Amino acid sequence: MNKIRKGDEVVVLAGKDRGRRGAVLRRVDDERVVVEGVNRVKKHVRPNPLKGEVGGIVEKEMPIHVSNVALFNPAAQKADRVGIKVLEDGRKVRFFKSNGELVDA
């Protein structure tokens, strides 16, 4: 079970975008995530008339390592660590380690 999932609101802990908040757009693999509005780079795109693509400079988000982000805790209004526990009915759920509140209600 992944501690950071698509759609989660996260805070960047390290790098040029430290302190910025954004939603996770997708997980690239087990170790990297793409966060909305974070780690934006300019890519030079060659025109491709077969696909109808116009060339130029495109700004897009690039993946960052999952260790450089933390889940945003709305109750505490800060980044927080996440743990995983098994409930009585056998379901695995994520919880915030600072206050024990469940992430997945």
Curated annotation (Swiss-Prot):
A GO term from the CC aspect: ribonucleoprotein complex
UniProt entry keywords in alphabetical sequence: Ribonucleoprotein, Ribosomal protein, RNA-binding, rRNA-binding
Single GO term (MF): rRNA binding
Protein's UniProt keywords contain rRNA-binding: yes
Lineage top rank: taxon: Bacteria
InterPro entries tied to this protein: KOW, Rib_uL2_dom2, Ribosomal_uL24, Ribosomal_uL24_CS, Ribosomal_uL24_KOW, Translation_prot_SH3-like_sf
Similarity comment: Belongs to the universal ribosomal protein uL24 family.
Function, in words: One of two assembly initiator proteins, it binds directly to the 5'-end of the 23S rRNA, where it nucleates assembly of the 50S subunit.
Complex formation: Part of the 50S ribosomal subunit.
UniProt protein name: Large ribosomal subunit protein uL24
UniProt organism field: Azoarcus sp. (strain BH72)
